[in-house]
Amino acid sequence: AQPNPPAQTGDDASQTETPDTAPEPAEEPEEPQQEPYVISSPTVDRGTVDGVTYVPWDGVVEHLFFHPIVAYPELAFDGDSQADGIDDWMVTVDEYDKILQSVYDRGYVLVDINDVWSESTDTNGQPVMIRNTLYIPEGKKPLIFSYDDVNYYDYMLKDGFTYKLILGEDGLIWSYGLDPQGNEVISQDLDAVTILDKFVREHPDFSPFGAKGSLSLTGYQGILGYRTNTDTKVWNDELEANRLKECEAVKPIIAELKRTGWTFGSHTWGHINLASSSLDRVKADTKRWMDEVGSLVGPTTILYYPHGARPDGDDVQSTGPIFKYLQEQGFRVFASVGISSYSKIKTDICAVICDRLHPDGTTLRGSDKVIGWYSQFYDARDIIDLDVRPNRGVKWTPKSAS
């Protein structure tokens, strides 16, 4: 766009004709008109709507989780100290795109983890968790997506990931980051959140209830790319002012995510190992998560174990002091990582324990047995991009030899 001409000054300005009537004041720019987004519950038997028949589903609700996805493999897999870890625990944009297409093609539809179980009371008036009957489009299967560490940690900023989520001029969620040449990039094709948003816009039947995914947040380097965290070692008024500014900046992002089917869960404040931490440490960490993260995203009943490490009581019939404390703080669904979408309702306390499957480098490179755990979702041999990943080999049998 051409710049505005400079204002006239001196004699030239005095010769400018004055209009008979004052110009109309400039109008304020209009806020972007957001498309309405409908979120509904799959626990309601809606019968047949618009030619789609909804039928009860009491089987397994599958659950896949992802870490942040690699936008620029040339930065992620550059041979530095982080490269192998990224190769183990992440997928690339291209791999993520293919996974979304595969689960869609295989008849999965997204549901919100918060709709799968509910808190109720038993015949003695004691609180218990119950598994809800879901009503799913006939021929479809329910699927939960969750995303760990959607914080945009400092170390990731130079290793091929996007930097933060932002609101675009259209009112939608976009990602912001720098490409390998250092150019600013605002995109909806480089981040797991925005890619799924776009996929659902293009395939609305993938999310018949409006659900997207559950964002599992720590707090030690802020959330969603905004440095909303405190530091107990070095702090001053300037740092606090910047933190408050970041808190205000992230609020509209949170609101838009919630409006469009995203929910939030805790990944602990400090990504602590709940299997080896003391009760005092868990208490301090949980309070800090509630103060710095929960105060922004709102209450949640979902706890995603860092490292998949299970605290005491992560079995059906016994509960230790750490698990009991976490349940007393409002957590009801406790999610680890495993080889299937296992879930059990605990009998001694009002809680659910469950596992999630993890599409990542370790499972995409895994043995025939490992990739078999994922075969209902995709064929790992079709997903993995060995052209951009480090040359670390695979354990599965090639298709031509299988």
Predicted regions and their residues:
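Short amphipathic alpha-helical segments embedded in low-complexity Lys/Glu-rich regions
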Residues: 118-120
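Extracellular/surface-associated beta-sandwich interaction domains
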Residues: 122-126
